[in-house]
């Protein structure tokens, strides 16, 4: 059964992890106080603030306290949906102002079009919001890559470390599990995808990266179908 769709992880696979941590995370942490003050009456932002209070079990937390909680979550790389939603909104602002572009590994930029020419669908799956993924790929070093994508999945689909998230993706794209290839640098994610029946490849971009018993590639140019 041939591959009909590829699901790619972002950080460490299509995107340098250092760009995520040093540029995007740092930018969002610094921008949070002013962004929340200026946008707290926005319905989406207000919902996120309420969700932060609920998750932190601090229903009466002030806006300043919510900022503290969010900045702590950024430090911990917490996979909390309200944080990821707010980060996406803040990054949208940063991209629009031209304060940074989205780093994408050149081998992915060079390969994505040839993958599509083989009638293979491409999806991304990240703990970052779908909106943040679209921003990353639309403002990339290689220009707007979003026309090559068929969809983006985030934490609303499920936790990347658990089988159910990948089952949900399979159901959404309406393919047999073995027709879907998941590519990630993270062993635990690959295990979960494998449990769901997907084919897997581990992206290994550095010599000191933790590896497992998965087929490995160091570049998207190594893909063969």
From Swiss-Prot:
Q: Which cofactor does it need?
A: Mg(2+)
* InterPro entries assigned: Enolase-ppase_E1 (IPR023943), HAD-like_sf (IPR036412), HAD-SF_hydro_IA (IPR006439), HAD_sf (IPR023214)
Its UniProt entry gives the catalysed reaction(s) as: 5-methylsulfanyl-2,3-dioxopentyl phosphate + H2O = 1,2-dihydroxy-5-(methylsulfanyl)pent-1-en-3-one + phosphate
Query: What's one Pfam family the UniProt record gives for this protein?
Result: Hydrolase
The intrachain disulfides are none
- Keywords from the named record: Amino-acid biosynthesis, Hydrolase, Magnesium, Metal-binding, Methionine biosynthesis
> Sorted alphabetically, which CDD domains does this protein's record hold?
HAD_EP
Q: In which pathway does it act?
A: Amino-acid biosynthesis; L-methionine biosynthesis via salvage pathway; L-methionine from S-methyl-5-thio-alpha-D-ribose 1-phosphate: step 3/6; Amino-acid biosynthesis; L-methionine biosynthesis via salvage pathway; L-methionine from S-methyl-5-thio-alpha-D-ribose 1-phosphate: step 4/6
Q: How is the cofactor bound?
A: Binds 1 Mg(2+) ion per subunit.
Q: What class of enzyme is it?
A: hydrolase
Quote one Gene Ontology molecular function term: acireductone synthase activity
Mind listing the GO biological process terms from this record? L-methionine salvage from methylthioadenosine
Keyword Metal-binding present in the record's keywords: the answer is yes
The EC number(s) given in the record are 3.1.3.77
What the entry lists under PANTHER family is as follows: ENOLASE-PHOSPHATASE E1
Q: How does it assemble?
A: Monomer.
> Briefly, what is this protein's role?
Bifunctional enzyme that catalyzes the enolization of 2,3-diketo-5-methylthiopentyl-1-phosphate (DK-MTP-1-P) into the intermediate 2-hydroxy-3-keto-5-methylthiopentenyl-1-phosphate (HK-MTPenyl-1-P), which is then dephosphorylated to form the acireductone 1,2-dihydroxy-3-keto-5-methylthiopentene (DHK-MTPene).
Q: Name the family.
A: Belongs to the HAD-like hydrolase superfamily. MasA/MtnC family.
> What name does UniProt use for this protein?
Enolase-phosphatase E1
UniProt source species: Shewanella woodyi (strain ATCC 51908 / MS32)
